[in-house]
Amino acid sequence: MDMNFDLYMNGVVEQARNEIESAGYEQLTTAEDVDKVLKQDGTTLVMINSVCGCAGGIARPAASHALHYDVLPDRLVTVFAGQDKEATQRAREYFEGYAPSSPSFALVKDGNITEMIERHQIEGHDVMNVINQLQTLFNKYCEER
């Protein structure tokens, strides 16, 4: 690969990581990290991050803005598809019944998947639509803070 392309992609990945982390999501980079968090009681929103356009233009902004709400999950975490492969694979093992999809969101409660917002529910939609989908999940499975 061209060195300039590699440098460019490293910058894109770093920006995507920083954007979701600054919104309050914890980066999970190993299978052990994933198990430690997802096996806990309570609710966890998992954002499956990626470098595609709909992740940057829709999913990450929605992940951030959806948190301006009274009903929220207990924990916010992220795995990065294509980057943190071990962590992403382990997270997907919890998402039984759902095909691998990125970007996407999974709401896990007491170690079990409740529902997912998959790529096809993000791509081609606007940020507000995805925020509404997330907040609907929060209302259904989470408690007011």
From Swiss-Prot:
<dbReference type="InterPro" id="IPR009474">
    <property type="entry name" value="BrxB/BrxA"/>
</dbReference>
<dbReference type="GO" id="GO:0045454">
    <property type="term" value="P:cell redox homeostasis"/>
</dbReference>
<comment type="similarity">
    <text>Belongs to the bacilliredoxin family.</text>
</comment>
<dbReference type="Pfam" id="PF06491">
    <property type="entry name" value="Disulph_isomer"/>
</dbReference>
<protein>
    <recommendedName>
        <fullName>Bacilliredoxin SAR1592</fullName>
    </recommendedName>
</protein>
